[in-house]
Amino acid sequence: VPYIDDPCGPAAQQRIKALRSGEGILLGNLRYLTEEISTFENAVKLEPKDMKDTYLVRSLLPLCDFYVNDAFAAAHRNAPSMVAFQQLLPTAAGLLMQKEVEALDNIMEHPESPCVFVLGGAKISDAFGMMKQVLQSGRADLILTGGITGEIMLLASGYRLGSVKENFICDRGLDVFVKDAEEYLKQYPYKIKFPVDLAYEQNGERKSVPVKDLPKEEMFMDIGDETICLYEEEIANAKTIFVNGPAGVYENPVFEEGTKRIWKAIAASEGYSVIGGGDTVSAAQRYIDLSDIGYVCTAGGAMVRYLSGNELPLIKAMRSAKE
């Protein structure tokens, strides 16, 4: 299939017009179009009906018979390529889109119990968005927290992480999540588990210490050994598992133990597992064969928003086209 570095300009239009039956062409990256970026990233509040007059749509519409979207990973982007063509052309979802939505709907609508969410990493806004949805809906039987998410839970429970770690959290504005964490722990005390020990580096080696005895001047970069064992047991008993984010700074060999052993526990589990997000998939590939995972979602931001109960612009546009 030939490629042309033009998404919708004169060169692209000429090549499309020259296509013969059975031929195809790959057009340039839409993300280089100002319209595609500004409508989503610069908060230009355009409705899909307003996007029908954008250059992209006006250029390609006369050359199209159908609109097929297979990009669930971009489903959270309110851009002309994602939401405008559905109003003007016969529309269909691609096979990958169908698989992605079905896998996530399986988690959201029909999870087999016990359903365990493993939430870690540094993007704690993602974790807290999902946490609220799956706790309020009753879909999560248990949430295992690691990374910064787990440390926020510790702060919300009254533990001190020492000046180094607490300054790290505050300097990045992540302490704003402590209030939400306190509320979740109050409402769902038996559904959220946080680390009972953390790990730091001492003389080049990993050292685990109980959360009640954390030193003040250390930087904690992984869940501790006892926490790992507790989480492994919960994962082994789970029937449905969703994972987003690593347990620690696995890129550093000193702090890879938590992430590595959790992934191996998930791979060995008989439960149905779903993972997604770039960092999550990268971490999984380092330690396990992805064929041991029930479903690997290609999406990051779109997946998080979908599981957080937010209506995605693409999904809304596709449903409107059906109606």
How would you label these PLM feature ranges?
Residues V1-E323:
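Active-site loop-to-helix "anion-binding N-cap" substructures in soluble metabolic enzymes
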